[in-house]
């Protein structure tokens, strides 16, 4: 609630901030993440009220929706995105494998809006001055500006854990679909790596389901888990 007020300029600080980190986080997590649906809803509403640049606001909206690695999102090139087919294809920096991200309707709408100011260039999220792309610290800086602690609460990379947890535990999506969309190494029953188009219809359905779920959370709906809808 206070983060939303900060984003709207109604408050200057969060009185609960000193309590952050008082409860130890679960071990084994490399990046802090928000996985409670109610807290996710507040964060998404804060993104809508972000008073930074339009380009950074678009990055904030797309980061949780697409849950790509932060470096891959900020380095996205317009030539890799087909808005008519609703697909984003690129080479994963970590594995060097080809990857395909089905773009939900909401992502296509945001990218079409973003195309007006940045579409004439190479990068979806261009940097300022001589920088080719948006800085690697931009998303985290925006989160801190909204009142989030990027050491203990959420980081740009934490959106991946957020999506994985909620897709699995709330929406009950098949784990292999989630891992494949996270661009993790997923192998078929014969031990071979899946092609980037593997399970594409199911992944398209999952990504649209995820974007719709985030919209409902943001709107304040009491979202009921859609059991098995992308299985």
Predicted features along the sequence, with ranges:
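Alpha-helical scaffold segments in carbohydrate-active enzymes
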Residues: 1-7, 65-69, 169-170, 209
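Short, Lys/Arg-enriched alpha-helical recognition elements, typified by the DNA-recognition helix
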Residues: 1-4, 18-20, 144
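Surface-exposed helix-capping loop/turn segments at secondary-structure junctions
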Residues: 5-14, 150, 216-224
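Basic, Lys/Arg- and aromatic-enriched nucleic-acid-binding interface segment
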Residues: 7, 11-75, 84, 94-97, ...
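Short functional hotspots where side chains directly engage DNA or cofactors
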Residues: 17-18, 85-91, 124-126, 155-158, ...
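Short, basic (Lys/Arg/His-rich) helix/loop patches that form interaction surfaces
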Residues: 45-57, 66, 101, 109-130, ...
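Well-ordered beta-strand positions in beta-sheet-rich domains
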Residues: 87, 98-102
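C-terminal secondary-structure termini that scaffold catalytic or DNA-interacting sites
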Residues: 105, 109, 113-121, 126-133, ...
């Amino acid at each position: 609630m206070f983060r939303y007020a900060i984003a709207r300029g109604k408050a200057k600080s969060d009185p609960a901030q000193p309590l952050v980190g008082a409860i130890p986080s679960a071990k084994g997590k490399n990046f802090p993440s928000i996985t409670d649906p109610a807290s996710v809803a507040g964060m998404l509403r804060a993104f809508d009220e972000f008073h930074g640049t339009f380009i950074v606001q678009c990055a904030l909206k797309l980061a949780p929706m697409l849950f790509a690695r932060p470096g891959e999102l900020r380095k996205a090139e317009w030539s890799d995105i087909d808005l008519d087919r609703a697909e984003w294809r690129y080479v994963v920096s970590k594995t060097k494998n080809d990857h395909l991200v089905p773009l939900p309707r909401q992502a296509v709408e945001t990218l079409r809006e973003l195309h007006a100011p940045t579409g004439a260039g190479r990068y979806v999220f261009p940097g300022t001055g001589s920088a080719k792309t948006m800085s690697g610290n931009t998303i985290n800086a925006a989160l801190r500006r909204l009142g989030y602690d990027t050491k203990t609460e959420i980081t740009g990379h934490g959106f991946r854990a957020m999506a994985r947890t909620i897709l699995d535990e709330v929406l009950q999506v098949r784990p292999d679909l989630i891992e494949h969309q996270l661009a993790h190494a997923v192998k078929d029953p014969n031990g071979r790596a899946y092609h980037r188009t593997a399970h594409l219809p199911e992944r398209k359905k999952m990504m649209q389901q995820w974007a719709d779920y985030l919209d409902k959370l943001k709107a304040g709906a009491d979202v009921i888990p859609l059991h098995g809808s992308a299985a």
